[in-house]
A protein has these predicted regions:
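ATPase catalytic-site recognition across NTP-hydrolyzing enzymes
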Residues: 1-31
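Amphipathic alpha-helical surface "interface" segments used
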Residues: 2-14, 195-211
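Conserved Rossmann-like nucleotide-cofactor binding loop
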Residues: 34
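Residue-level detector of short, conserved catalytic/binding motifs and their immediate flanks
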Residues: 37, 81, 174
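Short beta-strand scaffold segments in enzyme catalytic cores
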Residues: 37-43, 178
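Mg2+-dependent endonuclease catalytic cores in nucleic-acid-processing enzymes, primarily RNase H-like
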Residues: 46-165, 187-191, 200-203, 207-211
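Acidic, Mg2+-coordinating catalytic module of metal-dependent nucleases/exonucleases
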Residues: 167-189, 193
Length: 211
């Protein structure tokens, strides 16, 4: 069955609007070359809800090219408070720089994403659930994020582990969304969440480059 049967376009998808400049911004990425890379941008309102307002979804990008595209898309954005990237991107192959190092050298800041799969899936379920107090979910997606909207409701459960999704499915946007949700645990008090944002903002993403 579908892993996220609670996803409902009428509840979770909204038409784009101008995101307030003072809402903290998040960026999360799942990198691929032969398979698609997905980068998601989110903003956090003052009630702690995440609004996914932009996506980049394509394949065949080197780390350098992807970083350049990200920089161009963020030209008019405020500074990203937290940017998380698939931890595998820090793995070196041969003597050259890793994907993460290449992207950092080209002006995009990152820290490794929390890749705990089951807690990440649970956190996304919490975000998709309708809050009894507000009658609204804690996650909204702009209608322009077509690949996230297309793939999220179709991801099946794993046949070998019912607590996880099928990793052979088109899960690139899901992984990026999961990484983002894990930066914003819904169980934390609001003050703790924003204190964590401030802490992470000044945490070096890479000891070599000091970002």
């Amino acid at each position: 069955g579908a892993a996220f049967s609670e996803f409902d376009r009428s509840k979770h998808v909204v038409e784009p609007f101008e995101v307030p400049y003072n809402w903290p911004r998040l960026r999360a990425a799942d990198y691929g070359y032969s398979s698609p890379s997905c980068v998601l941008w989110g903003a956090v309102d003052w009630d702690g809800n995440i609004w996914i307002y932009r996506e980049l979804y394509d394949k065949g990008y080197t780390g350098e090219t992807l970083a350049r595209i990200i920089n161009a898309l963020e030209e008019h954005d405020p500074l990203m408070q937290i940017s998380v990237l698939d931890g595998a991107c820090w793995s070196k192959h041969g003597t050259g720089p890793s994907i993460a190092e290449t992207m950092i050298r080209n002006g995009t800041r990152w820290i490794p994403a929390d890749k705990n799969r089951i807690p990440g899936k649970i956190e996304l379920h919490r975000r998709l659930a309708v809050d009894e107090r507000t009658d609204e979910p804690k996650l909204k997606i702009f209608s322009t994020c077509t690949n996230l909207i297309r793939t999220l409701p179709t991801i099946p459960l794993s046949k070998t582990n019912s607590e996880d999704v099928d990793t052979k499915a088109d899960d690139h946007a899901y992984d990026a969304l999961r990484y983002m949700c894990m930066t914003r645990p819904t169980g934390l008090p609001q003050n703790s969440i924003f204190n964590q944002i401030k802490k992470d903002s000044f945490q070096p993403a890479d000891s070599v480059f000091g970002y």
